[in-house]
């Protein structure tokens, strides 16, 4: 098998989370969409196979059509506990989701405050421990602290989901070093969650070694949600292929891509030679 074939094979490897087998590494959210028709077209354009839905919004009426869209396109629903501030509320919401949707999957969110929407690590760890003990497949939304991410893995979470930046800010990945540390230490999938604003940032997440990217606002609030969904799909694929293909090492000094043998005029000066005449 050629190097090209090996890289393609590695980049095409399915993502496994719990009992899920996903060929798309782009996970979509539904928050922020103003039109069910646009949301549906964006989800299809993204190629996603797993999409989050906030259970606190689950009610009869327009929100029901989200589940109809997912069923129509065979997209797995990932209920989340968005809006929960305590472990108790998150556990209650997860149990309601299991009863309503007949699934053990849950994206666990326990936020500290409305201004940052960042996780409360104490409540998050408490909720994760109890949900795992009750046979939930927990995908935990966490901050970019490698210690907390490792703790969640040790508790039995099926995936850890560090934030690139606060939800909805579009600030991208504020601490790529910490994301790399989380990836290097993890033995479960790492999913970059929150903060993505454009396609290049989704690519960067995959280049850093994340196994998938979850985003919502970057698509639902874009000027052209369907076009942005397509861009995100390609960005995740490109980032994954770049990661598995292996980037060149960074160097302090230039290195010519072509040999200097056979140069007709001039000479090559070393880095210490003076350029002045």
From Swiss-Prot:
Its main location: cytoplasm. The active site is at 107 (schiff-base intermediate with dxp). GO terms for biological process: thiamine diphosphate biosynthetic process. Keywords: Cytoplasm, Schiff base, Thiamine biosynthesis, Transferase. It catalyses: [ThiS sulfur-carrier protein]-C-terminal-Gly-aminoethanethioate + 2-iminoacetate + 1-deoxy-D-xylulose 5-phosphate = [ThiS sulfur-carrier protein]-C-terminal Gly-Gly + 2-[(2R,5Z)-2-carboxy-4-methylthiazol-5(2H)-ylidene]ethyl phosphate + 2 H2O + H(+). Signal peptide: none annotated. Pathway: Cofactor biosynthesis; thiamine diphosphate biosynthesis. InterPro entries: Aldolase_TIM (IPR013785), Thiazole_synthase_ThiG (IPR033983), ThiG (IPR008867). 1-deoxy-D-xylulose 5-phosphate binds at residues 168, 194-195, 216-217. Its EC number is 2.8.1.10. Catalyzes the rearrangement of 1-deoxy-D-xylulose 5-phosphate (DXP) to produce the thiazole phosphate moiety of thiamine. Sulfur is provided by the thiocarboxylate moiety of the carrier protein ThiS. In vitro, sulfur can be provided by H(2)S. Belongs to the ThiG family. This is Thiazole synthase. It comes from Cutibacterium acnes (strain DSM 16379 / KPA171202). The gene is thiG.
